[in-house]
Amino acid sequence: MLCPEHTRTERLASKVLGYCGSCLSEKKDLISEALLTHRKLRSTNGLVGLVARDGKVVCDGCGNHCRLSEGEIGFCGLRHASGSSIIENFPGQAIVSWYYDPIPTNCTSDWICAVTRKRELHTPRERQNNLAVFYGSCNSDCLYCQNVSHKELTVAGRPLMTPEELANVVDAKTACVCYFGGDPGCNAEHSLSTSAHIHEKWKIPICYETNGNFSRKYLERIAEVVLQSHGTLKFDLKAFNSNLYLALTGVSNKTVLSNFRHLAKIGRAREHEFLVASILLVPGYIGISETKRICRFIAECDVTIPTVLLGFYPHNYMLDLPRTSRNHAHECRKVAEAEGLVNVRIGNIGLLSQEEYNVE
């Protein structure tokens, strides 16, 4: 559909939000309606509707910092408040599944990856697989989520694995590990413990593919794991404008941006690539203007941070949007480079379409 406020300029909008990215960025009165949409859809799926803000018990498990009342469950579904404490629903375990992904994978940082390029690590030829670790919970609620099956796992509360059990999956053919989901952001302690067990036996790269919404208490430990193992921290910057981010994901990006700044500072002394920014080009929402804001933010942190522009594929509640067009991707690349970024690429080129729409 076309945004009702921009029919003359034909700006795309998804029915689930009813307005385009420009309207959501500029009109705060639309955000309450967007959050109501998130709450209704999540409640229908058996999930906690919104990030709790009225309770007295603060959860520091991730960057949402839910403020929970007695017995209330956090947004991620993994923790609840009891008395004055936060209690893990699955002590010592996480809702997680895994599979082996033959290399080369569809990794968003493949062009700077030590395993793929074999410049920094001498990976034995027999190591041919990436261990893809899929966490079945998330601290975000992207309306276009590409891995929405994590919600079913959250509700089911299974499969469950301890860090030791997950680490034991690694074998001699494993070249690297990537935590994604869902998101490792609300499973930080489990991922760190798993990584420690892995490195007792295997010296392989550990990577994170994340929305970046970590609790600060875990951030430097995760950075250390990634840096020391020669992995990458793939950070999905969904939007810079706070209202737009809230409308698309149901959560704030305040901690996300703060975490990215902090990681960029850590990465300035890097000997190999460490932090990678990814931007999903969602038609009608993440166009030239918003991409410019995101890239300006990245450039202010460090112009050398590798940045990948990703094509959008219609999914979840945004099935009515087209795939990202080639024109959209190429115009956004021009914007990224104009903002000073020196290592920009367009990813998943095979998804790009010939659709014509307003890419502003």
PLM regions with names:
Residues P159-L321:
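Conserved AdoMet/S-adenosylmethionine-binding subsite of the radical SAM
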Residues K28-L41, V58-D60, R67-P102:
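Hydrophobic scaffolds flanking metal-cofactor catalytic centers in soluble metalloenzymes
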Residues G74, L131, L275:
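A broad, low-specificity signal marking well-ordered, structured residues that form hydrophobic/aromatic
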Residues V58-G61, A132, C178, K234:
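Structured core elements
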Residues G21-S22, V57-L78, F134-V148:
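Local cysteine-cluster metal-coordination motifs and their immediate loop/turn environment
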Residues V16, E33-L36, E72-F75, R79, ...:
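A generic "cationic amphipathic patch" detector
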Residues L78-Q228:
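Conserved Radical SAM active-site core
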Residues M1-V48, R53-D54, C59-N64, E70, ...:
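Auxiliary Fe-S-binding modules of radical SAM enzymes
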